[in-house]
Design a protein with these regions (language model features):
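Active-site histidine-anchored catalytic micro-motif
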Residues: 2-137
Length: 137
């Protein structure tokens, strides 16, 4: 029986503001390689109330469609009780702050057009961190 290894890493980056997309795919793959884990899972978590993770294609037209969807679904202006950025919090509850991806033969497995993307929903530039945990053998 093989012991399960756990490798933890943090990646910190800056965002410029509302509905910005940051592709994290290469950083997750780099972390998997650093871990030495060949088979298992990579779990990525964004510990923020106004940031989400999505698996999507990074075509600019699709990213714009996602932006428009979020803006129409939860408009910036509304009868919100929370001051200043309620819409950012509400957009973040639509999608989870984490994703789990398979690791096979030392590689993160993405679909043909998939990338792991952080979506900034807050209105101000922010320093953001994601926690990347790789488990396996």
């Amino acid at each position: 029986m093989t012991d399960v290894k756990v490798f933890n890493a943090r990646y910190t980056f800056s965002t410029k503001g509302e509905i910005e997309f940051v592709d994290l795919s290469d950083k997750v793959q780099e972390t998997v390689l650093q871990s030495g884990i060949r088979n298992g899972i990579a779990h990525v978590f964004a510990p923020h109330a106004t940031g989400i993770l999505i698996l999507t294609e990074t075509d600019p037209s699709l990213l714009n469609d996602i932006r428009v969807f979020l803006e129409k679904t939860v408009p910036r202006q509304g009868a919100y009780e929370h001051p200043s950025n309620a819409h950012a919090h509400l957009r973040s509850v639509l999608l989870p702050p984490d994703k789990t991806l398979p690791v096979i033969d030392g590689q993160v497995e993405f679909g043909t057009w998939q990338s792991l993307v952080f979506v900034e929903t807050d209105v101000h530039p922010r320093k953001r961190t994601v926690i990347i945990q790789v488990l396996g053998e």
